[in-house]
């Protein structure tokens, strides 16, 4: 819950335990809160400007994480290119919209062990966090993971478990909490909104000479998974393509928006959307087929990524060939053929972009594997 300062609309400031939901609602309505307006910032670009309100007293600015990656000489690659294409791509915050809202049960047994039963996607980390919050040894905190009624990464962050545990300790009774859909939407983390500026240099035959990408993600008020998202975005920025010169910068920024957290494709979606969209634009300007420009630049077996990881097996070209055949692409894109989704019996096909990734020790390069 907020302490001294509320940083986003939807942040909890008080919790009430009652015999019924109706009584709890009446008790909540009786609480009167006086707010003192404070300067706020809702745009990541504005949050990085001199004089912008700093959200957290312990931090010198609103930057949560910056991940730089450098390979080769980007400016030289641009100078040698026949075509330079620069575009900006944005993605929005997205609600997880799982069927089951946040819910949990907490109780304290005769040995003083606090038990929380909840659909939790990050149970080990949350156990350690709760031990700190409750000022208890880890042996006195027990988490039980109930079946998860949909998560998609949205239940990796600890939003309500601390309140549950504290209420159980204060009341000495079991406490159950179930968010309404409105409470779930307003208070829980969303996918990181992003703005990506992508500049690419290519030869006339479609070979990519250089890539420069700057990704700014809105971490919201607390940036719950922002550091991990920024690392993954940087590692996967160039996609499964062999590019000799790469410059990538990913930035996570605090704002007074709803916190951003984990969502499926953890950090990969933002950069993949920009990269794949950009390749389509470049293919059109060069008069190349979208599948062909990807085949030209696709990594092969034994390729080394821009984070120095060697890939022993790369199936991209095989996947592209299979997708091209399955989509009937040789007859032209579906929209140019006048086909509808019902005619095709499937969605339009997009070439995939995916690599696994792990983070190595500080003295080693970030590596995708």
Where are these regions (language model features)?
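Structural alpha/beta core scaffold segments of enzyme domains
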Residues: 1-369
